Amino acid sequence: MPDSPLGRTLVIANPTAHSGRGEDGARFAQEFLQSYASATRGFEVVRTQGPADATRIARGARGFDTILALGGDGVIHEVVCGLMALPREARPQLGVIPLGSGNDYARTLGMARNDVEAALAQLVRGRAHHVEVGRVNGTPFMQTLSFGLDAAIALDTTNRRAAGTSQEGEALFATSALRILFNAREGFPVCASFDGEKTQDLSTIIFAVQVGPSYGGGFKICPNADPTDGLLDVCYNVKLPALPRLMALLGLARLGRHTGSSVVRLRRCRSLTLDFERETPCQADGEKVCGTHFDVSVVPDALDVIFPS
């Protein structure tokens, strides 16, 4: 792409993102790229029409240099799934135009959130870096995979967004947490093995596998997670805390200050295997995942993703 920062560009936009503001964002992106002709070697703007549409579109994006995903973490997840279906050498670089209520992947990248003009300005001046992608039972995730209480909360926030709640980000996560807490205090028995090591028997309330530091709209569950290091960061509990302590830990996690608790363990790994005693709430980038057995791994240098300069 010697003559333009983005080359031949495909914008995949979710018009319903951020309570319908995605359509305005798609129009602005089109006007911006038309007026800033040197940014691309031609572009297209395609709007999604339903679930998994962004995956289908991204999978067919051979020949493009750049895909820009416009919307929340959901559309970014779908685009990543589509890109990962292509051979490595055929995958366009990825840029994100964050327009959503969670925007955790945008936080990881340092992108402007819910400001299409600012995000586009960052992208045309940005630089691509190799980043990892996680996999769970073969399905990619680009930011977070979680089980137990935090997964139940994440799925509840997804359902509430679909129902039209006015809450966003940390406030949405916190109120969903209060709704779920009282039903999840017994824990979820699981056998866990990290990198093929000896199996650990846990009764977990929180088990988060991260590519980037945050989930839930800014909760820094693995504050040192780095999407370029080729490792997954994992946070889980090793004891069942009483409800007041659990609520306090969730509050500390907002700032990444829960990591010193004797209840919490953090570690890094390249793979892990989880066998739950019963079906347990599970989500990958906000999408529900079903089952009791989970093979989790990391794909280093899976994608080229644009970071702000």
Regions found by a protein language model. Name each.
Residues 146, 150, 208-222, 288:
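Glycine-rich phosphate/pyrophosphate-binding beta-alpha loops
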Residues 150-153, 200-202, 214-218, 242-245:
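Short acidic/glycine-rich loop or secondary-structure boundary segments that cap or lie
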Residues 159-172, 217, 223-244:
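Gly/Ser/Thr-rich active-site loops/lids in small-molecule metabolic enzymes
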Residues 194-201, 226-227, 232, 236-309:
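ATP/nucleoside-binding phosphotransfer catalytic cores, i.e., glycine-rich phosphate-binding loops
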